[in-house]
Amino acid sequence: MEKTDKMKYICSYCNTYVYDEEKGDPETKLDPDTSLKEIPDSWLCPVCGMPKDYLKPVSNEIFDIRAKSYTETQHQAKDINYYRSIARNMLHGICGEYEVCNGKPERMCSGQKFGRSIGFGGAGQGKTFEENYNSLQQYKLKMRVIKDHKEPEMSLTIFNKQIALPVMGSSISGVRNSMNNSIPEETFYRGLLQGAMSSGTVGLVGNTNDVPDDLGVKTVGENHGWGIPIFKPQSQERLLELIRLAEELNVLAAGVDLEGAGSTFWKTANKPVYRKGEKDLVELVDSTELPIIFKGIMCREDAATVLDVGAAACYVSNHGGRVLDGAEGIASVLPEISKEIDGKIPVLADGAVRTGYDVLKILALGADVALIGRPLARMSLAGGEVPVKLYYRYVKNDLRNAMLLTGCDNLNEVTMDILVGPSQG
């Protein structure tokens, strides 16, 4: 009998694991000559944990290259750097996954794109992205170590739920437009949400123009409602429908990405987005019992309006520098916005937050919760829940050390007094 050619596969999620039907895989207990159809439905990729549906046929040439790489790293500890290397491969040409993600001009993602997708970079020349990093680094932490020892308390309550640390994942979307179309959008959302939930905190997801605009909120619903969908500023009618769906799915909260009015992706896809006036915001808040968050607040005047309309939280963000070039960095505007809010509602803020030390600075500048974007996006691309959880743990450990060494026993003690910077030095 003529021997049937055996197929070779690569996991399309992690782009790392390879499987040869002829040889099988002792690690996952697959005997030689086990075909793809014969692999049990319960089988999971040993690298990223995804099911067999992600195994895709690959040529012998590509298989040999990937097999060598996989063999070399098969027994390597699966730490953050391991997943960073996977992300670097998946984002080839648009993100170098550098040790410091700062938007500097020499970075792969930076610079004018002249109509091409901005990938992981910023709008225009990327100056706002860069300024987010620079403005935060202008502040230094004041070390204070003579104090009775106490383990820092990092938990807090927000939207009537307790979370283990004052860190969340910022609202991210757009795998096809910005991330080399490397994995399905829903899989990306799931990694962000599940990684946050298993870390004792909350993930946010956005919506994007090239998949159904309710995919994010539905994925949150599938995650037992543990997550927050943030919608682009679409028509008022559509936003009311999406918020109604969020309420039916019993999500923690919902929000509108007001700075998304400048989204080039939605504009080029012929899907209009709009600026929203005060009456629009009131209508959205009054339409639901859900806590409503307004994102994209970058000035004191808008913060006052967010308070006036009855929002549940004020989210300070310039979309990671991806909508308006030449704008102020988050750390430059956060103190005055926090002063305007005056503790009446929670203040959320993102903007070049990479470590627990950055988190402490953002909290000291007036935020109740710091949000992380690009690093968590890369972790979700590289392996879903597992690396996302690893990154949260890394940030939490740094935050613990930062609080310990600045004399902060709890979050109430995190104030501008622990900073030295433009207005303190």
Where in the sequence are the language-model features?
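Short linker/helix segments within small regulatory modules
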Residues: E27-S42
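Alpha/beta enzyme core
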Residues: Q194, E222, Q234-A349, G356-R374, ...
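An N-cap/entry alpha-helix motif that binds or orients negatively charged groups
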Residues: I65-I163, S423-G425
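Short metal-coordination and nucleic-acid-contact micro-motifs, chiefly zinc-binding Cys/His arrays
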Residues: D5-M7, D41-S42
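N-terminal functional module of multi-domain proteins
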Residues: S117, G126-D214
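Short, cysteine/histidine-rich loop/knuckle motifs that typically chelate Zn2+
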Residues: Y13, P46-V47
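Short, non-ligating residues that shape and space the ligands of small metal-coordination modules
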Residues: D20-E21, Y54-P57
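The −1 position to Zn-ligating cysteines in a subset of zinc-ribbon hairpins
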Residues: I10, V18, L44
